[in-house]
Swiss-Prot record:
Topology class, membrane: Single-pass membrane protein
Phenotype of null mutants: Perinatal death due to a reduction in fused muscle fibers. Embryos are motionless and lack skeletal muscle: they are nearly transparent so that internal organs and bones are apparent. Myocytes differentiate and harbor organized sarcomeres but are fusion-incompetent. Myoblast fusion is impaired downstream of membrane lipid mixing step mediated by Mymk and defects caused by the absence of Mymx are due to impaired fusion pore formation.
Family under the similarity heading: Belongs to the MYMX family.
Segments for region (Disordered): 60-84
Protein name: Protein myomixer
Extracellular side: 26-84
GO biological process, one term: plasma membrane fusion
Ranges that cross the membrane: 5-25
Organism: Mus musculus (Mouse)
Induction: Up-regulated during differentiation of myoblasts. During muscle regeneration.
Motif (AxLyCxL): 48-57
Keywords: Cell membrane, Membrane, Myogenesis, Transmembrane, Transmembrane helix
Amino acid sequence: MPVPLLPMVLRSLLSRLLLPVARLARQHLLPLLRRLARRLSSQDMREALLSCLLFVLSQQQPPDSGEASRVDHSQRKERLGPQK
């Protein structure tokens, strides 16, 4: 019977670990976000910041697997050196 218990144990461990992290983030991030909102009172400034943020987030996409495998293969060849 240990197999059905494993997901439940993992879930409870994760919730116990993540809850304090979420509280800590909320305590520190909310005042910063409120201060930022006060500074960004103009609509143009908010839109400019949002567009920059969306651009940065769109650039952090993981490479597709085909591209990564080609890079791994070439790096492996460089590490191994010339074949005899």
